[in-house]
């Protein structure tokens, strides 16, 4: 008999990570999208999270800081966009932005 592994991403872990982001970065929106939001994630699936907020400097450096401070206990693919960039990318048909905004689960905002 084989046991099914526990999922890497849990509701409680998502809540803790989101709270850390909100407390430290004040994002306008935090949205879970992809397989975790659709409910068809496997036990080893990561969490795809879109964060919409204003920030200075490089989005790469900001994402690294957010991951360091947020210290997720699960694998995460963090997509960071300024509000105007998210709107522009949505208009261009960006599949990740559209998936997040049209079908994602709002964790904050």
Model-derived features: positions:
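Catalytic core of pol beta-like nucleotidyltransferases
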Residues: 1-29, 38-43, 53-109
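Short beta-strand->loop micro-motif that forms the acidic, two-metal-ion catalytic signature
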Residues: 48-51
């Amino acid at each position: 008999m084989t046991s099914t592994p526990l999922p890497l991403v849990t509701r409680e872990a998502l809540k803790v990570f989101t709270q850390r982001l909100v407390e430290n970065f004040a994002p306008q929106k935090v949205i879970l999208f992809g397989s975790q939001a659709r409910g068809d994630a496997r036990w080893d699936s990561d969490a795809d999270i879109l964060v919409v907020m204003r920030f200075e400097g490089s989005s790469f450096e900001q994402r690294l800081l957010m991951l360091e401070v947020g210290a997720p206990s699960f694998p995460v693919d963090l997509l960071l966009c300024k509000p105007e960039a998210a709107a522009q990318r949505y208009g261009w048909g960006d599949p990740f932005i559209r998936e997040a905004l049209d079908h994602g689960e709002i964790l904050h905002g």
